[in-house]
Amino acid sequence: MRGGAEHEERAYVYMVRCAGGQLYTGWTNDPGARLHAHKTGKGAKATRAMGAQRFAYLERCADRSDALRREAALKKLPKPKKEALCAEWEGKNLPRLSVATRADAADILEIYNWYVLNHTATFQVTPSTLEEYEDWVDNTRKVAPLLLARDAEGKLLGYACAHRWHPREAYDWSVESTIYCAPDARGLGVGTLLYRALLEVLDVCGYWNVYALVADPNPASEHIHQRLGFSCVGRTPHTAYKWGWLGLSTWWLALRSGSEKPAPVRLTSPEETAAILKKYGSI
């Protein structure tokens, strides 16, 4: 999983649910970074005092001026109308987890190519083709199930998967995680939901180590990895050049420990995968 700076200008209006049930309204260019700021006490005074938890509402706007106008309108709404908006939004955006097939390649590619063109979360600079990604889906599913999160209307909110850490046989028990969320789904908890489900799948498969490569610096991504139990095991500056020099940090999570010879890894059965996904979202 990588994270980094965004190249495309975007604007959103949002409401954040706080610990006591209160709603805080604001606007932002980067939902994920803004929610992280609110949750870590670096956002508004109100959310520092009330304890921000999650987005209860998020709406993309045409530009900053439109977001400011929409923010002012939302702030004037009485609490019952705000709650009604949040309930409708949450009903539409509640993630439904499933396993990807080759037929999902186009939806996955749409998300990934957005990051290629607009973000340093990936160091790729040339968009991939559908043919490449259909093959990519097939190859990825040989390592572990490729997990999807969709909303109630079927829109892809994000995906999570694993790849071999190294092609040599002795590395068979180590994988690299990959997670991307749709631009409008960042900061909604979709990534964490997918990540937790993926880690449980990888554990059942018999993998020992999960690695993640993160564009450096990226406090929000690092916070997620720390919360999930990863440790940073290395940082290298000036690793890649995409709209400027970028560093890279390597994160590691041990799924099991010991010195005995490991059992061969295997794919989870459809029943095992379904049971795991049921814990994190409907399938």
Predicted region positions:
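Conserved GNAT-fold acetyl-CoA-binding loop/helix
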Residues: 109, 113-136
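A short beta-loop-alpha structural element at the N-terminal edge
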Residues: 96-108
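C-terminal "cap" of GNAT-fold acetyltransferases
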Residues: 238-283
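Conserved catalytic-core motifs of GNAT/GCN5-like acyltransferases
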Residues: 161-164, 211-214, 231-247
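Conserved active-site alpha-helix within GNAT-family acetyltransferase domains
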Residues: 192, 216-234, 245
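GIY-YIG nuclease catalytic motif and its immediate N-terminal context
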Residues: 1-94
